[in-house]
Amino acid sequence: MFCCLGYEWLSGGCKTWHSAWVINTLADHRHRGTDFGGSPWLLIITVFLRSYKFAISLCTSYLCVSFLKTIFPSQNGHDGSTDVQQRARRSNCRRQEGIKIVLEDIFTLWRQVETKVRAKIRKMKVTTKVNRHDKINGKRKTAKEHLRKLSMKEREHGEKERQVSEAEENGKLDMKEIHTYMEMFQRAQALRRRAEDYYRCKITPSARKPLCNRVRMAAVEHRHSSGLPYWPYLTAETLKNRMGHQPPPPTQQHSIIDNSLSLKTPSERLLYPLPPSADDNLKTPPECLLTPLPPSALPSADDNLKTPAECLLTPLPPSAPPSADDNLKTPPECVCSLPFHPQRMIISRN
């Protein structure tokens, strides 16, 4: 039919005897008479095709799609009911959400890759610029060398951090050990104090003070008799060697002046030989005590500070106005009444 129409349209709307003969010779079951009923339909179709070509193409595509849907069965296998459509809509929503999540992941990955690529491009640009500058100045620097230096710096930094952490751990262990030793020392000190308190409490107060006074007096007597300063480690030996032939120390009822005078050894007692003792080598021989010392070769700066021998026996003039220190000074008559000791004269000259 369309072939005939096209042929008639190409022939300018004029029928030929050949076309009429072809149409009339067709069988009735294949061609049931004229479809369009005459020539006016040809003009209508021609105008329609010229003006509504796009609409016809759309209708044709829609018909083709519907025809294909009727021929091929649907993949979902539903009959178009409301429940099936709702399930399909929900599945489509889930699928769209999954697609959206996948797209977001893809975009995130793309941004990360883009950032890395931009960093590499920037590093390459910097390296190129540095290489160009170093090439002008006679140097050369590559990206591998720069990365190697960066890795070396990172390793050095990590090594320093490791050393600092080890030093901190060692310091903590040392402080813990010192704290342990301090606790042990404090416990030992506490035990020592308890032992001292225990043995000190075993001596009664009535027996404790005379013993201390006896040792102290022996030490003072040793100092005055030997002319040496007081050394505590000589006190026990002197007390042991000289306890038999020395008089007992004075009682506490005497005054301080009487005690000091009684403890001093008289000059005539130095002439008699004493029993041998441990400190004989430290004492001055008796013949050396009476021998005058030779005069000094050169005058020294301390000559003005020494007291002459004749001034020792001269009474001091009384002070003009009485003061608060008069009671502390020695009266002139007491100075003259003191016995003469050649040993004191030798010491004063020295």
From Swiss-Prot:
Q: In which domain of life is the source organism classified?
A: Eukaryota
The record, for Pfam families, names: NPIP
InterPro entries (UniProt xref): NPIP (IPR009443), NPIP_N (IPR054697)
Renumbered residue ranges of the record's region Disordered: 151-170
Which family does this protein fall into? Belongs to the NPIP family.
Per its record, how is this protein called by name? Nuclear pore complex-interacting protein family member A5
